[in-house]
């Protein structure tokens, strides 16, 4: 119940938008102002569903598309565009998420105590849009230097967090306000459609935005500006749609901050109990009963109910702390894996679309299939047991992810740092080859023909780009080749015959600060085309040669 309106719990998986509203009636808090009754919005096709909710649902779909689309590519943006390491990228990603989860408190305070829900949504949505625009501009390589990109990105993310979190406690409650008190069934169905819009926006955006990032090239690389620009455009659409329905909305004035009243009640009860902690004073049934000298029995009863619910929520922060790693550590893990499904390559940041997809699939499966079957078996599968089962499954999922990560680390390619590079050799000649690189003591043993390369050898460079001299000996003959090596690169030196003599070719892959297990390279040498798949630190490499 929110300000006298019975709303349902809209807790979305990983969504800061869905705040838990304390069941405190409007009568518990003195209203600041009384306004005349609002004009009721016309019904949709003669039903009891107000036309105004259509604008709210469309707004929610576009806003969720905007938020999840931007967030899907955020970690890879930190790693590959800002060139941060994985630890820093993960820390900033979760700091942003934390701010998104905290700012609903600010939004609720503003809406309840000052502006009301409608104006709060409008003003903070404008802040939201500005943040998106700044974030998109910061992803354009030609705009400033590295420091400018970081400043623009952090400023944009701060505004986005304030905007997206600030409107969270308002939108769902504002939708509930549009219904008359007697239309409980219609209001409950509205929240079902509202939740569907949330997951539909999340599903489409987490699948599409990574395609815009990796499938479209701009400024000579992945198009992060487009990946952030499209969500920005959707947020502008969300704001315009919401404002369009202005004349149809039922707007309730701010009626005081309920959360503040609850906190005051709890503090007063604790202080009163401490002051009267004496054997001569009779004990009370519940510690909150010590607030009865100042607060109504109704408010005290409702606060008791709220504290009981909060006690059940104690394990939830641990669950969500793990769950939110889908966008950080799990996405980074996906960059080290082979996601080629018979020609369809799943982008690492696209993995997140599985969450809303499975939500939409499993909700009807569980509600109309599994749970009725459990009831037929006379198993008392209470909500608490469902929560416990979900947490156990989450633990098993992270155990599986840990095992996968250990296997990846065993075979992961090394990450070169500045003034450092790595090299390995593939011999396509018909006999053994002895190879030396001037200034380095590497490759002491002859390299056999078509031998799977050994582990990468490290090259310490004197500058960000250095020429190396490669000397090869084959059947009593020797030749020398010069190659340019960039810092922070992983190189494949290919030896092959050309006109009866041996020569070399280098194929390089520039590191972006993250480990890679699979590296597919293509080298064109005279009379043959080589496609080589390196599986780092493994003897399971393979090559295909087309003559």
Whereabouts are the PLM-identified features?
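Short acidic/polar inter-strand loop motif in beta-rich domains
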Residues: 473-481
